[in-house]
Amino acid sequence: MTAILERRESESLWGRFCNWITSTENRLYIGWFGVLMIPTLLTATSVFIIAFIAAPPVDIDGIREPVSGSLLYGNNIISGAIIPTSAAIGLHFYPIWEAASVDEWLYNGGPYELIVLHFLLGVACYMGREWELSFRLGMRPWIAVAYSAPVAAATAVFLIYPIGQGSFSDGMPLGISGTFNFMIVFQAEHNILMHPFHMLGVAGVFGGSLFSAMHGSLVTSSLIRETTENESANEGYRFGQEEETYNIVAAHGYFGRLIFQYASFNNSRSLHFFLAAWPVVGIWFTALGISTMAFNLNGFNFNQSVVDSQGRVINTWADIINRANLGMEVMHERNAHNFPLDLAAIDAPSING
């Protein structure tokens, strides 16, 4: 009898836990994805803060030349970063217990791998939590779909690219200057500016900014006046009101006359879908571009593609970009190799007579 009561009590505790986890009445929704999201993001955040402040230099290139990234080792907020895991580790799973000591783990950049893997798992669970809450509230799932764009971008630079290049040392450093370094080296090695998927991503980000600004300014300019001239127009809105807060007909007419009639949406739902879809699709393409360039399917190469009737090269902007790429690659990992791969690929002459 005692055993039966204990089992019922444990089932009751589990049931209460399940109801609490999945309740939409909580101030912050947890959900089953949140059960995994909370510890992974807390771990990633805690280790990032500690490592950014106090981590010792990391031998990123695996050539016994450590690179400093933390504040206590001479960096500031701009130059500081979590240095990627050493090339000596490659793609190996490198938890603390795999190192001979904590000092060795820190020297080989173990915190980077720990942070990145927990972060990616955490943001993926955050996306799942968005879907879970939408499902329980009877909403459509497009919030999680939109969030999949930055999740895909983060996965591309922190996981797919290192896998394609063969080492976590090629991942994006977790810092401002480190991000810029990653971008410059990526351009030097993959000519990303000449990749059509990157171009679509630029169109998505800048186009999304333009459309967001246009929409916000049109709505703000066509608000239905509910206040006097001495009051803020914002005071005329009450949360949850059934009436439209702006005149979509006036906004449609203005924009149609400013550009042309069919440039303006006459359906508020299709308009907002477009505002969401444009940047999301653009960032999807950028993430896909990073993922293909990870395996060295690089941007277009139009170097020396224009010649005159005598066969002399007429330089184009593509040739200028190529020259810049070579210069950037020479400066990258300057002690690990002396020449860009493009130049070093030529067979050296024999010196044996």
Swiss-Prot record:
* Residues binding chlorophyll a ChlzD1: 118
> Which reaction equations make up its catalytic activity?
2 a plastoquinone + 4 hnu + 2 H2O = 2 a plastoquinol + O2
Annotated residues that bind [CaMn4O5] cluster are located at: 170, 189, 332-333, 342, 344
SUPFAM superfamilies from the UniProt entry? Bacterial photosystem II reaction centre, L and M subunits
Q: Which of this chain's residues are annotated to bind Fe cation?
A: 215, 272
What does the record note about the cofactor?
The D1/D2 heterodimer binds P680, chlorophylls that are the primary electron donor of PSII, and subsequent electron acceptors. It shares a non-heme iron and each subunit binds pheophytin, quinone, additional chlorophylls, carotenoids and lipids. D1 provides most of the ligands for the Mn4-Ca-O5 cluster of the oxygen-evolving complex (OEC). There is also a Cl(-1) ion associated with D1 and D2, which is required for oxygen evolution. The PSII complex binds additional chlorophylls, carotenoids and specific lipids.
Keyword Magnesium listed: yes
Q: Which residues carry this modification: N-acetylthreonine?
A: 2
- Which protein are we looking at? Photosystem II protein D1
